[in-house]
Amino acid sequence: MSVKKINLLDLDRKGLRALFSEMGEKPFRADQLMKWVYHFGVTDFEEMNNINKVLRTKLAAKCEIVAPEIASFQKSNDGTIKFAINVGQGQEVETVYIPEEDRATLCVSSQVGCALECTFCSTGQQGFNRNLTVSEIIGQVWRVSQFLGFHKDTGDRPISNVVMMGMGEPLLNLANVIPAMDIMLDDFGFSLSKRRVTLSTSGVVPALDKLGDAIDVALAVSIHAPNDELRDVLVPVNKKYPLQEFLAGIRRYLEKSNANRGRVTVEYVMLDHINDSTDQAHELAILMKDTPCKINLIPFNPYPGSPYGRSSNSRIDRFSKVLMEHGLTVIVRKTRGDDIDAACGQLAGDIRDRTKRLAKKQMQQNQISVTME
């Protein structure tokens, strides 16, 4: 029976240094290896010519460097690319590359599915299977970098920003998300600025406190409603961590963070005649008055079976103007990749749902149909 090899993509620099120490090697070997993997895209130990032959042989016997494969991809008319990433056992997660004039952002998944059941999000309706490993999270960045033209000779990289806004709730997978983000920030990893790595959360407050103690990255928060009554429906985790508790956690995070420059990004999906009235805009402004923030209004992106519609441009404009009258900074997000279901809230992947959510929903729909007949 062969011994399972250690995937070195599962280890941040601290973990790699511990591994090399166990092998009787100097800690700086971890720095050398990371530079080969993340700066030059090399996964074959034999190509690492500043590591001696004996150590290369030891590494090959005990370790491997394996990123998940791209199963397929689609390119939008606006240049956005959606990747289906094979994470094994017949399952796929989705990763989205969004090129712009001044940046190139990769939207990364943290879980196979999602347990939070936000009612406006396609991923939330697919159910949940498992957390992604460190290698499956950082491997999305590595694999897409290779696909886009990672230059081994110069070390030039095509990704300037990473957002943990793909499938899953990152704060429910902190044990793997934090080391993955460490690699993104590490000078020997992807060497991204802490202001260019963003984690988005729906509000798992105890984990948000742990995040603030462990790492400093930009924070985006999914609010989506100006009061608990509506947010309980749209974002069910609100029943456990209501808005005032969430906002207090956000303020605690901001006190620890330099990456956010003192304010958080508030994400607010615009649902037609659900959360987009001028009264609700006033209510949102009052809610956020003690929390330094900028508001990102997100036009809803419909998906098959969605119960909601997108707010009209005129309703979004009115909502935005009310917020600005209260002195808030407001950005209306430009929709990208919606023609290939790669926009915010549309990611689904291929999930074997351990929660049986889709099956339960179908059963409920069948029962309703029988009753109506």
Curated annotation (Swiss-Prot):
Enzyme class (EC, first level): transferase
EC number(s) on file: 2.1.1.192
Domain of life according to the entry: Bacteria
Compartment(s) where it occurs, according to its Swiss-Prot or TrEMBL record: Cytoplasm
Binding site for S-adenosyl-L-methionine: 168-169, 200, 222-224, 301
GO cellular component: a single term: cytoplasm
GO terms classed as biological process: rRNA base methylation; tRNA methylation
InterPro entries (alphabetical): Aldolase_TIM, Methyltransferase_A, RlmN_N, RNA_MTrfase_RlmN, rRNA_lsu_MTrfase_RlmN/Cfr, rSAM
Cross-referenced HAMAP family: RNA_methyltr_RlmN
Name this polypeptide is given: Dual-specificity RNA methyltransferase RlmN
Organism: Shewanella frigidimarina (strain NCIMB 400)
